[in-house]
Amino acid sequence: MESLIFIAPLAGVISLVFAAFFAKSILKEDAGNKRMKEIAGAIQEGAMAYLNRQYKTIAVVSIILSFLILFLLDDGLKIAIGFLAGAISSAAAGYIGMSVSVRANIRTAHAASSGLEKAMSVAFRGGAVTGLAVVGLALLGTSSFYILYGDVDLVVGFGFGASLISLFARVGGGIFTKAADVGADLVGKVEAGIPEDDPRNAGVIADNVGDNVGDCAGMGADLFETYVVTSLAAMLLGSLIIGTYENAILYPLVLGSVAIFASIISVFFVKIGKEGKIMQALYKGVGGSAIISLIAFYFVTNSLMGDIRLFYATVVGIIITVLMVIITEYYTSTDYRPVKTIAASSETGAATNIISGLSIGFESTLVPTVVIVIGILISYFIVGGAADAGIGLYGIAIAAVAMLSTTGMIVALDSYGPITDNAGGIAQMANLPAQVRKVTDALDAVGNTTKAVTKGYAIGSAALGALALFADYRSKVNLGGQSLNLDDPVVLAGLLLGALLPFVFSAVTMSAVGKAAFEVVNEVRRQFREIPGIMEGTAKPEYGRCVDIVTKAALHEMAMPGFLAVLVPLLVGLILGPKALAGLLIGLIVVGFMLALMMDNGGGAWDNAKKLIEDGNHGGRGSEAHKAAVVGDTVGDPFKDTAGPALNALIKVVNMVAILFSSLIIHSGLF
């Protein structure tokens, strides 16, 4: 059984090989005419310039933190090396995804001239590169450091590095993409009355760059981190029950390995049938990945663990994944009541649109929360949690690992979104034939749904993963002679601070988007006013000015959320003690999960309500209802693409800080 540990790094390498294979196949596709290449080149240049500047900024922070880890912790050198490796791996996943995404967009636009099937194939393969790179690097890094160190506690540094990069990528990318999007929409659609992706809008290139920065690199880093820390949490909890299950640490890694093979196989399932239904084709891949993974999990569990109850926990994880996807699609798709309600409310103005959108966002927390609660209880008790709490908590962690078995496909779906969005923008700006735009519009409409669905999945997996991380922190606190009681005022104080943190964090990120969007709006207005011929199409806007504005804003504003995530748990732990920090973690997980659900689903519903009106309903484009829906969409944009997704990263970073510095915190504090 010992040799099975090497299946994990091998699976990681194979995943990266297939990612390279798909990337090479995309680059062989035709990149279109000169005008298309000019537009795509501007998007590519802006995206890579931002990513390079972001990583330089993060590198400075990472080096400072690595020295703190080196000098403050036992085995600091090993943990610091792991931390830097985790940060580099997460950055590499984002870099690979971004590099392919900004090259697949133009090829998708050109392929649209050959029809829907060809264009969809190029876009999905582009997404698959990011998906396979994310899971490959995550499993390769986690397993390699465990093999190298032989102690799962020392692998925590790798998880912390992945978490920190994810937070910065989510916050910085979210500020960039939504400041550009909101600014471009408010002036272009509402004031100037020009369509989306119109080349006369100075913010249009920044908007297209932002799609890649936020939805490709951002989501890639987010799910890379979730994959790493959830696997790590299961391994940490497994180390506590090694007397019952000798392979408890190895089991999550083997599950991840077979799931990678399932994802690779399932990529080839994604083909449009005779009906021409794009979403159905994409769901074939996700469904195939889940089913193949479950079959493999059954044999792995029987041979490695000898306890069928653990297989049942993996089934729970897969069911949660399916339900989260269905629920999110219900609340964010144009086919169902929530989005139709918001669209109808737009007829009476922006105020009723906002009220309706907030209501739908709040409502959307109900069913997912019930699903997660039931999943937690079943996975805890089905493995024997009533008799042994440690095994029950391990069952929850295994359910979370099973949820992540579809990560490769889920990231592929998410990255498909910005590729098709950019393809539509390139087609519009390059004045390609109406038939091409019709194909890219069909792809983009599905891309909006996939982006929303993957956010719901990310929140659910983050919640289960964070609960497993908290369980490990609690075990470390108990080992230090501390007990946790909810009637303890110190724990309650921590609970309130933890519940507060998501609101403060969201305030900072939302404010950053508002300030940057204000600058973009003023810049686009200035260009319309001062550069003659823009509206007539005889003069070219200064696209670079808007890209520069949002780049500077994103890099400047992402520092504060990062400091909050690292310093707050450290200060609470060092000043108030480990019990208060435990309370903070509980409050953060509960409130952060709910708030993220509300923001992601509410924002997605606002976005698609606008698109429903643009499709000719409730007066269509240019109507008063459309103007109200654009206002709602611009409120929902930072909800669903900045603050909401960043809360996932916040929850996991704070938990990783607590675990990493638990040995320091356990002997500190006033209480």
UniProtKB/Swiss-Prot annotation:
EC number, UniProt record: 7.1.3.1
Any one GO molecular function term: magnesium ion binding
Residues given in the record as Ca(2+) binding sites: D607, D633, D637
InterPro entries recorded: PPase-energised_H-pump
UniProt subcellular location: Cell membrane
List of residues binding Mg(2+) 1: D181, D185
Residues that coordinate or bind substrate: K178, K640
GO annotation, cellular component aspect: plasma membrane
Domain of life: Archaea
Site description Important for ion transport, residues in chain: R170, D215, D222, D641, K652
Sorted UniProt keywords: Calcium, Cell membrane, Hydrogen ion transport, Ion transport, Magnesium, Membrane, Metal-binding, Translocase, Transmembrane, Transmembrane helix, Transport
Cofactor annotation: Mg(2+)
UniProt site (Important for potassium independence): K451
Chemical reaction(s) catalysed: diphosphate + H2O + H(+)(in) = 2 phosphate + 2 H(+)(out)
A Pfam family recorded for this sequence: H_PPase
Binding site for Mg(2+) 2: N208, D211, D421
Main localization, broad class: membrane
Transmembrane segments: 3-23, 57-77, 79-99, 128-148, 156-176, 223-243, 249-269, 285-305, 310-330, 366-386, 391-411, 452-472, 490-510, 558-578, 580-600, 646-666
Family: Belongs to the H(+)-translocating pyrophosphatase (TC 3.A.10) family. K(+)-insensitive subfamily.
Function: Proton pump that utilizes the energy of pyrophosphate hydrolysis as the driving force for proton movement across the membrane. Generates a proton motive force.
Subunit composition and interactions: Homodimer.
HAMAP family assigned to the protein according to its UniProt record, in alphabetical order: PPase_energized_pump
Protein name (record): K(+)-insensitive pyrophosphate-energized proton pump
Organism of this sequence: Methanosarcina acetivorans (strain ATCC 35395 / DSM 2834 / JCM 12185 / C2A)
Gene: hppA2
